[in-house]
């Protein structure tokens, strides 16, 4: 009969993972509870997988993203910019906001090629590269969510306060709003970066993405507060829609613009929710006093989970052009007209029109009606 160790006799399992610090006055029961919480933490989704299995899964997901989503996001956002700029005289106020949203998404899609094959999260060991990618990611995130928040507020003004705000809802004020939103997005990223960089300037492995204060700001300013405002706007919009339906009904054009903005907001929420939950779980866990950001990096602890939530966030920038193409009838007509102008050969012209007709459904309204000034 084989000899057993004392640990085996009492059924004790030895925990080899990272050890959490225990308070000086902690009891054995409290220490065991903290270890149990660590093992059952929500972020620990891949504890039963080997490093090789996690690498294979991450590589497979990265290939799927690169083959299917990246071309849609890259080409789609460029088309939104090129087509709308080509017909700038027919550009509406919602189109102007969507152009800026497409520019922000295009930045992230281009940056995603670096991040998408960061399979073992080793890019975060390079301080300059980690900080560079984090800055681009945050600027895109802030600009996207700020534009969506402002677009929701603009829809509320167009539906509920049309008479009072008609003089202020002009293209000039829309361009000014876009400029202010970009300034706010850059400031919300660079001001915290400057502050924490001065404090951690002597740390060789400093990474902007791993600073807890920056992560709290990202979750609060980039997710919780904007979506609270968006939720309030849409609750007021629903009330305005009920009133409009009772009295005179709502113009079809306003309904379509509202439906498209709501779809973009919903996709943004679904794609960015895992990233913010992942960061929040890390922030709510205990941190050892005096630890540097390198030692607190949650992306090193859960590389596969971090990779999955990053891919989900990048997917938002790839799906927005699809929503804009299928729900934006004005853009579909502009795209057909743009293709007709750029394809001089009759055979190529017919092929492009047939392809567009097969991929993008026909509009139900005439083009001259859709190109009229928007609300």
Curated annotation (Swiss-Prot):
Glycosylated residues (UniProt): 32, 44
Swiss-Prot/TrEMBL GO biological process terms: adenylate cyclase-activating G protein-coupled receptor signaling pathway; apoptotic chromosome condensation; cell differentiation; cellular response to estradiol stimulus; cellular response to glucose stimulus; cellular response to mineralocorticoid stimulus; cellular response to peptide hormone stimulus; cellular response to tumor necrosis factor
Tissue specificity as recorded in UniProt: Expressed in the brain. Expressed in neurons of the hippocampus, hypothalamic paraventricular nucleus (PVN), supraoptic nucleus (SON) and the median eminence. Expressed in magnocellular neurosecretory cells (MNCs) which secrete oxytocin but not in MNCs which secrete vasopressin. Expressed in glial cells. Expressed in the nucleus ambiguous. Expressed in epithelial cells, in pachytene spermatocytes (PS) (at protein level). Expressed strongly in vascular endothelial cells and poorly in vascular smooth muscle cells (VSMC).
Record gene name: Gper1
UniProt feature coiled coil, ranges: none
Modified residues (N-acetylmethionine): 1
Residue stretches spanning the membrane: 63-84, 97-120, 133-153, 176-194, 221-236, 260-280, 307-327
Molecular function terms, GO-annotated: chromatin binding; estradiol binding; G protein-coupled estrogen receptor activity; nuclear estrogen receptor activity; steroid binding; steroid hormone binding
Membrane topology summary: Multi-pass membrane protein
Superkingdom of origin: Eukaryota
Biological role stated in the UniProt entry: G-protein coupled estrogen receptor that binds to 17-beta-estradiol (E2) with high affinity, leading to rapid and transient activation of numerous intracellular signaling pathways. Stimulates cAMP production, calcium mobilization and tyrosine kinase Src inducing the release of heparin-bound epidermal growth factor (HB-EGF) and subsequent transactivation of the epidermal growth factor receptor (EGFR), activating downstream signaling pathways such as PI3K/Akt and ERK/MAPK.
Family: Belongs to the G-protein coupled receptor 1 family.
One GO cellular component, as annotated: cytoplasm
Post-translational modification: Ubiquitinated; ubiquitination occurs at the plasma membrane and leads to proteasome-mediated degradation. Glycosylated.
Membrane topology (Extracellular): 1-62, 121-132, 195-220, 281-306
InterPro entries referenced in this protein's UniProt entry, alphabetically: GPCR_Rhodpsn, GPCR_Rhodpsn_7TM, GPER1-like
Source organism: Rattus norvegicus (Rat)
Oligomeric and partner information: Homodimer. Heterodimer; heterodimerizes with other G-protein-coupled receptor (GPCRs) like CRHR1, HTR1A and PAQR8. Interacts with RAMP3; the interaction confers proper subcellular localization and function in cardioprotection. Interacts with KRT7 and KRT8. Interacts with EGFR; the interaction increases after agonist-induced stimulation in cancer-associated fibroblasts (CAF). Interacts with EGFR and ESR1.
Cystine connections: 130-207
Localization in the cell: Nucleus; Cytoplasm, Perinuclear region; Cytoplasm; Cytoplasm, Cytoskeleton
Keywords: Acetylation, Apoptosis, Cell cycle, Cell membrane, Cell projection, Cytoplasm, Cytoplasmic vesicle, Cytoskeleton, Differentiation, Disulfide bond, Endoplasmic reticulum, Endosome, G-protein coupled receptor, Glycoprotein, Golgi apparatus, Immunity, Inflammatory response, Innate immunity, Membrane, Mitochondrion, Neurogenesis, Nucleus, Postsynaptic cell membrane, Receptor, Synapse, Transducer, Transmembrane, Transmembrane helix, Ubl conjugation
Cytoplasmic topology ranges: 85-96, 154-175, 237-259, 328-375
Protein name from the UniProt record: G-protein coupled estrogen receptor 1
Pfam families: 7tm_1
């Amino acid at each position: 009969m084989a000899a057993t160790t004392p640990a085996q006799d009492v059924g004790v399992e030895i925990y080899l993972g990272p050890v959490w610090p225990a308070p000086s006055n902690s009891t054995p029961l409290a220490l065991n509870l903290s270890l149990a919480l660590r093992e059952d933490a929500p972020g620990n989704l891949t504890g039963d997988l080997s490093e090789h299995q996690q690498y294979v899964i991450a590589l497979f997901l990265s290939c799927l993203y690169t083959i299917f989503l990246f071309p849609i996001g890259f080409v789609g956002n460029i088309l939104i910019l090129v087509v709308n700029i080509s017909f700038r005289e027919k550009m509406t106020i919602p189109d102007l906001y969507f152009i800026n949203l497409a520019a922000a998404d295009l930045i992230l899609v281009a940056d995603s090629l670096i991040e998408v094959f960061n399979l073992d999260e080793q890019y975060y060991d390079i301080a300059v590269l980690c900080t560079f990618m984090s800055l681009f990611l945050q600027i895109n995130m802030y600009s996207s969510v700020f534009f969506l928040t402002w677009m929701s507020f603009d829809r509320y003004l167009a539906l509920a306060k049309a008479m009072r705000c008609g003089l202020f809802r002009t293209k000039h004020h829309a361009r000014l709003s876009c400029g202010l939103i970009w300034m706010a997005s850059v400031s919300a990223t660079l001001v915290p970066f400057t502050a924490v960089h001065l404090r951690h300037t002597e740390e060789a492995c400093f990474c902007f993405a791993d600073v807890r204060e920056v992560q709290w700001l990202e979750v609060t300013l980039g997710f919780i507060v904007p979506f609270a405002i968006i939720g309030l706007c849409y609750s007021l919009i629903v009330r305005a829609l009920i009133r409009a339906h009772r009295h005179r009904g709502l113009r079809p054009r306003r309904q379509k613009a509202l439906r498209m903005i709501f779809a973009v907001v919903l996709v943004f929420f679904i794609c960015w929710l895992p990233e913010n939950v992942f960061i929040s779980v890390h922030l709510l866990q205990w941190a050892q006093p005096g630890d540097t950001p390198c030692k607190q990096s949650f992306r090193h602890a859960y590389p596969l989970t971090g990779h999955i939530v990053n891919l989900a966030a990048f997917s938002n920038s790839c799906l927005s052009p699809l929503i804009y193409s299928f729900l934006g009838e004005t853009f579909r007509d502009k795209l057909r007209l743009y293709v007709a102008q750029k394809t001089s050969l009759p055979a190529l012209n017919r092929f492009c029109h047939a392809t567009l007709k097969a991929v993008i459904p026909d509009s139900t309204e005439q083009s001259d009606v859709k190109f009229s000034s928007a609300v």
